[in-house]
Amino acid sequence: MYKRQVIGNGVVIDPAHLVSEIVLLRGQGAEITPQTLVVSDTAALILPLHQAVDAAREALRGAGKIGTTGRGIGPAYEDKVARRAIRLGDLASESTLDAKLQALTAHHNVWLKASGEPEADPAVLKDGLMALRDDVLPFAGQSWRVLEEARANSRRVLFEGAQGVMLDIDHGTYPFVTSSNTVAGQAATGAGTGPTNIGFVLGITKAYTCLLYTSPSPRD
C-alpha cells in the first residue's frame, strides 16, 4: 500500500514538537523519512516567542480569558496573516532568517515591553531554530505537488483536520474559537489542492460542542 504523510501549508508547526514526535514514533518502530513525510515549506512556525505572548495575553484577560492552550497557536496565525511569519523554508537561508527574526521581534517586543514582560531576543530564537534545522529541513517540500502527483496517479488521499466546527474562526462560538478554519472546506486551501479534488466529506456529530478549556458553553 502506498503511504505518505503530508503536513500542509495551512498548519502552524512547532518545530521542536515536530522533532520530538518524530523521535517518539521512530522509537515505536514507525518509519519516518523524507520519503514518508512531507511538511509544506510554506507552513508557518510556532516559536517560543508566540508561546510567551499567548500566556501573557491570557493572564492579562483575567476573568475574560479565552482559554487558549498556551501553545502559541493564535499568535503564530496572527503573524502568518500579517505577513511576518517565519516559515519552514526560511530555515534554509540564514540571511533571510536573520532579517525576518529582527522584524518579528521588533513587532512583538513593543507589546511585551509595555506589558512588563521580558523582550524576545532574535539571537536566542535563531539559535533554537538553527539547532533544529538539520532535523526538520529534510522533510520540507511542496505539499501541493505531492497531492497533485497523487491525484494524477489516481491514488486515494485522506484529509484529516483537527477540532470541531464550533471552534472554526468564522463559524464557531466566536471569540471562544481557535485561530483558523476547521470546517471541511479548509482541507483544500490548507493542503494545497483544488476544492473539486475532494470527493467525499465525512463529518462526526456529537451531542455536545467542542470548546476551548475555559470557554463558556452556548447555554451560558
Residues of each region from the PLM?
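Conserved small/polar residues in nucleotide/adenosyl-binding loops
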Residues: M1-Q5, Y213-D220
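Glycine-rich phosphate/pyrophosphate-binding loop regions near the starts of catalytic domains
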Residues: K3-A16, A55-R57, F176
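Short, glycine-/Ser/Thr-/acidic-enriched flexible segments
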Residues: V11-I13, V23, A44-L45, A162-V165, ...
